[in-house]
């Protein structure tokens, strides 16, 4: 018996094959009523897509020569355009997202926190629809780690993903670095270099947004040393901008031999320390950090993976909130640097701060 083809289904539905193809992928460029009618007809007639054909077509659509396929929206919830340009993490995430989107034939429309369109958020779903947006990426979660309530009307209909930080709610797809393993491996690297008293310096708000993954891994990575947990915890200092005096007081009391941090400001502060200078490593290392060692979180790959999540679900016609959200995590790589040698590092006035 001859299998039902897309051409047969198109003839029965009274539309073209391209319309059927888009409707079966639940593409928002086709009216919802038409999509539902064609999907119901396909089910009634027993139509099944040929998986090999779908694979080949997917490869063709994702080739480097792909023409314009649609648009993605990148929404900076707490991120202004200027902050996105200044912050090395956001810059890398955006670069990875935009480069991958371009390679797949997608345009990226940006909506920043200081954009009037974003501030008038009740109108944003209509704007996205008018622009033919097919997928949405969110960047910069609020401190409580949840998406704002006004995004519900967007994520209930669009393919959506969060960049960089997994939201506590709602359950939508996320692309991020594996922050727990990043911190854990960084401590192990310091141990391998003979450091016995590493300390952790970071913003408590950031660690809370990451549900404690940096600090939890810092503690867990040292339990095998036999040192009591409460003594290890004393070597965590919650960073406060400009609080150099409290930092130096804590540093003198705890006497760490190495510091893991997300704050470059620590280096010039340490020049006023009256004890031995520690080795330094950054938990979110970037090539712009002259002389620093640390963990390269591969944020460009995180950004690219977010595009792959969006495009793969679009290809399967999966829109709205997923039944089971995917979290794609990228591992970090250790990068050596002069900051592991305090005498050399602090004698060089060109180090990043």
Task: Locate the predicted segments by residue.
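Flexible loop/turn connectors
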Residues: 6, 19, 249-353
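Hydrophobic alpha-helical segments within soluble ligand-binding/sensing domains
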Residues: 173-200, 242-248, 296-318
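An alpha-beta-alpha
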Residues: 186-225, 319-341
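Periplasmic-binding protein-like
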Residues: 73, 132-141, 199-203, 233-236, ...
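N-terminal helix-turn-helix DNA-binding module of bacterial transcription factors
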Residues: 1-61, 353
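Amphipathic helical "hinge" segments at domain boundaries
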Residues: 47-125, 134, 219
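Flexible loop/hinge segments that line or gate small-molecule binding clefts
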Residues: 139-182, 279-295
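Short beta-strand elements in bilobed, periplasmic/extracellular small-molecule ligand-binding domains
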Residues: 101-115, 198-201, 212-242
């Amino acid at each position: 018996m001859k299998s039902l083809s897309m051409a047969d289904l198109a003839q029965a539905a009274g539309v073209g094959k391209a319309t059927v193809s888009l409707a079966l992928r639940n593409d928002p460029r086709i009216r919802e009523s038409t999509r539902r009618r064609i999907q119901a007809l396909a089910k009634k007639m027993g139509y099944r897509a040929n998986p090999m054909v779908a694979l080949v077509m997917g490869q063709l659509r994702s080739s480097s020569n792909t023409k314009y396929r649609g648009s993605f929206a990148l929404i900076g919830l707490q991120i202004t355009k200027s902050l996105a340009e200044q912050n090395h993490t956001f810059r890398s995430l955006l670069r990875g997202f935009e480069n991958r989107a371009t390679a797949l034939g997608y345009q990226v429309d940006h909506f920043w926190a200081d954009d009037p369109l974003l501030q008038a958020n009740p109108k944003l779903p209509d704007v996205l629809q008018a622009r033919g947006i097919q997928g949405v990426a969110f960047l910069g979660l609020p401190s409580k780690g949840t998406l704002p309530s006004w995004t519900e009307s967007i994520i209930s209909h669009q393919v959506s993903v969060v960049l960089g930080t997994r939201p506590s709610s709602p359950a939508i797809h996320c692309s991020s670095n594996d922050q727990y393993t990043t911190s854990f491996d960084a401590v192990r690297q310091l141990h391998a270099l003979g450091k016995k008293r590493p300390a952790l310096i970071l913003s408590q708000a950031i660690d809370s947004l990451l549900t404690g993954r940096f600090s939890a891994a810092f503690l867990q990575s040292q339990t095998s040393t036999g040192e009591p947990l409460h003594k290890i915890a004393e070597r965590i200092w919650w960073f406060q901008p400009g609080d150099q005096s409290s930092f130096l007081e804590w540093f003198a009391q705890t006497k760490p031999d190495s510091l893991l941090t997300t704050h470059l400001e620590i280096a010039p502060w340490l020049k006023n320390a009256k004890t031995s200078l520690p080795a330094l490593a950054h938990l979110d290392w970037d090539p712009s950090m002259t002389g620093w060692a640390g963990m390269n979180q591969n944020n460009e790959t995180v950004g690219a993976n977010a595009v792959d999540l969006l495009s793969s679900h679009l290809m399967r016609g999966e829109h709205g909130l997923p039944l089971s959200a995917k979290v794609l995590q990228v591992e970090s790589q250790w990068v050596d640097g002069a900051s592991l040698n305090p005498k050399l590092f602090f004698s060089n006035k060109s180090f990043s701060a």
